[in-house]
Amino acid sequence: MISFFPNKPMYHVQPHISFITPERTMKTIPAFSRWAFAAVAGVFVFAMQVPKVKTTILQPIAFIGDHFKDKTPEEDKWL
């Protein structure tokens, strides 16, 4: 009898954890990283007004730190 498939395909189970496979993970990493970047940027937009965030996180940044320093004269501060 002649075989229809002289080089038979080798079927095997793809490695997975539940429904998460390496192929599916590689497809979702770019989308996840974009959403994570947008979430972090959103947190910084809302947290920029908090004085503790300004002094401890934003002011030490090299090029944009001067933007967050308070340059208001003392006589103009009322709080």
From Swiss-Prot:
Keyword Membrane: yes
A Pfam family recorded for this sequence: QCR10
Ranges per topology, Mitochondrial matrix: 1-23
Disulphide connectivity of cysteines: none
Ranges of the Mitochondrial intermembrane topological domain: 48-79
GO biological process, one term: proton transmembrane transport
Entry keywords, A to Z: Electron transport, Membrane, Mitochondrion, Mitochondrion inner membrane, Respiratory chain, Transmembrane, Transmembrane helix, Transport
Chief localization: mitochondrion
Keyword Membrane applies: yes
Membrane topology reported for the UniProt record: Single-pass membrane protein
Places the protein is found: Mitochondrion inner membrane
TM stretches of this protein: 24-47
UniProt-listed InterPro entries: Cytochrome_b-c1_su10_fun
Annotated Gene Ontology cellular component terms: mitochondrial inner membrane; mitochondrion; respiratory chain complex III
Subunit-structure text: Component of the ubiquinol-cytochrome c oxidoreductase (cytochrome b-c1 complex, complex III, CIII), a multisubunit enzyme composed of 3 respiratory subunits cytochrome b, cytochrome c1 and Rieske protein, 2 core protein subunits, and additional low-molecular weight protein subunits. The complex exists as an obligatory dimer and forms supercomplexes (SCs) in the inner mitochondrial membrane with cytochrome c oxidase (complex IV, CIV).
Described function: Component of the ubiquinol-cytochrome c oxidoreductase, a multisubunit transmembrane complex that is part of the mitochondrial electron transport chain which drives oxidative phosphorylation.
Family stated for the protein in its record: Belongs to the UQCR11/QCR10 family.
Name of the molecule in the record: Cytochrome b-c1 complex subunit 10
Encoding gene per record: qcr10
